[in-house]
Amino acid sequence: MNIIITGANGYIGRYVVKELLNKGHKVIAILFDGESPHSFLSGAELFYGDIFALSQEKKVDLVQNAECLLHLAWQAGFNHRDPSHLNNVMKHYQFLTSMAELGIKNISVAGTMHEVGYFVGPIDANTPCNPRNPYGIAKNFLRQAMFDFASVTPELNLRWLRFYYITGDDRFNNSIFTKILKAEDEVQEYFPLNSGEMLYDFVDIKDLSLQIEERIISKESGIFNCCSGKPKSLRTAVEEFIAEHNLKIKPKYNVFPARSYDSMAVWGAK
């Protein structure tokens, strides 16, 4: 399958590109002008440009012979209150709908558990959404808008891939584990945390890439979890990470309160 990937050079994108190439797919990886491709993109066709500012001519060139679009691009995903989420959401929508109008009939879009908002228990495709921060609000709007567009575009096969907490290659994922490694490098004795009692869904980046590949080549439309399906406490995840990496730093709990929009137990249903 010939697959266009936005955000191809990002933390998730580079692993997905590698997985798709290993499975024999042709990948068209979109990068910003002047961006240096990660080594995992070796073998992919590189397409340079800002997806929010592509001319019609460049869009036509992009979709030639392509069968599928995987939209991973998103700015400031780890800063849930960044103004870019709401400022850019219509640009994402306009890009995606323009791709469909140019003939791409299989579109998969990265979603997030933060669309759901405060919720306790397993999340599935029918879980009500009431997002509590700009990141979740923007992603939730994009999901609703895209499925509305799909409802009047019957030839479009739309898949919404809902991501959870991603681990692996932790030097580069900007997660709590990245911060633990940075604190270890700085020879800090303790790493401050909240209670650590919350249960989350942690999925390794390599497993996530496999799940994404399976979904984007399927013929199903709808909302799909890309997750482990297993709740694990933050405390357990942190202590396992420290032990596995032979770190000297120690977790210090109850330094920070939990975020107002974080539930005590939330994970993806599989």
Swiss-Prot record:
Pfam families associated with the record: Epimerase
Binding sites annotated in the UniProt record for NAD(+): 11-12, 50-51, 72-76, 87, 112, 135, 139
SUPFAM superfamilies, A to Z: NAD(P)-binding Rossmann-fold domains
Pathway(s) of this molecule: Bacterial outer membrane biogenesis; LPS O-antigen biosynthesis
GO molecular function annotation: oxidoreductase activity
Residue ranges that the Swiss-Prot or TrEMBL entry lists as coiled coil: none
Catalytic activity, reaction form: dTDP-6-deoxy-beta-L-talose + NAD(+) = dTDP-4-dehydro-beta-L-rhamnose + NADH + H(+)
Function: Catalyzes the reduction of dTDP-6-deoxy-L-lyxo-4-hexulose to dTDP-6-deoxy-L-talose.
Residues reported in the UniProt entry to bind substrate: 112, 135
Disulfide bond positions: none
Enzyme class: oxidoreductase
Enzyme Commission number(s) of this protein: 1.1.1.339
InterPro entries referenced in this protein's UniProt entry, alphabetically: Epimerase_deHydtase, NAD(P)-bd_dom_sf
Family, per entry: Belongs to the NAD(P)-dependent epimerase/dehydratase family.
Keyword field: Lipopolysaccharide biosynthesis, NAD, Oxidoreductase
Domain of life of the source: Bacteria
Isomerase listed as a keyword: no
Name of the protein: dTDP-6-deoxy-L-talose 4-dehydrogenase (NAD(+))
Catalytic center residues: 135 (proton acceptor)
GO biological process terms held by the UniProt record: O antigen biosynthetic process
